């Protein structure tokens, strides 16, 4: 089963894992590979169920805590979501990131979902400095979620950072402006952005919709008032990080979660 998963033959791997499912709770690598295979195949309901079967409070299981936390988060069970998200801050074999990164991002959104704006930003402040650009992105989205007066400025400051290619976030600024009924300003942004990033396909598509007055099409892709949409973008970023490191298996894992949270984008 594990060999097939490594070769990305996910359907074959799923069948083989299912035959030897008795290994669960005895073989941690089996649990990890089977859970990832379920995600690769978009079998999220089965992934949630399997996570509940193998979860153990005494043992850190990164993927299981991540999926269970997301399950409870989407069900608006924020107490149980918090329990699992906080465990993601611990360094373990299954947590490839520094302590206090993924868990704090998810906790920030968990607090935002219960309208606790102050606590939401406190969790962002706990994220390690190496991820300061991700902090800026999440901060912009949370400000947008709470309709903060500084949302526009936050997006503008993000785009002014020339040390990193934030061209994608012109779309989110335009999206925000359209929700604020500032169509003229949105058109000015896309005109400038297309001049700067002529090969960006997302911006090219956005320009097409704007020129053809299909503003609702742009708004249908993303809504910062829907926390699942913003979390989907976070997991999209993680997928890109792993892709840049040529770890395509983990990249696909996070990309699948991103698409599960927001199938429209």
Cite the ranges covered by each PLM segment.
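Short, structured interface segments
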Residues: 203-217
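Generic helix N-cap/helix-start motif at coil->alpha-helix transitions
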Residues: 24-31, 58-67, 94-106, 128-139, ...
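N-terminal, post-signal-peptide region of Sec/Tat-exported proteins
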Residues: 5-46
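Structural motif corresponding to the intra-repeat A-B loop/turn of tetratricopeptide repeats
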Residues: 7, 41, 75, 114-115, ...
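Alpha-helical repeat scaffolds
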Residues: 14-18, 44-57, 79-92, 116-129, ...
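Alpha-helical segment of the N-proximal tetratricopeptide repeat
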Residues: 1-16, 230-257, 261
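Residue-level signature for tetratricopeptide repeat
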Residues: 3, 37, 71, 110-111, ...
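Mid-chain, structured segments of secreted extracytoplasmic proteins
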Residues: 29-75
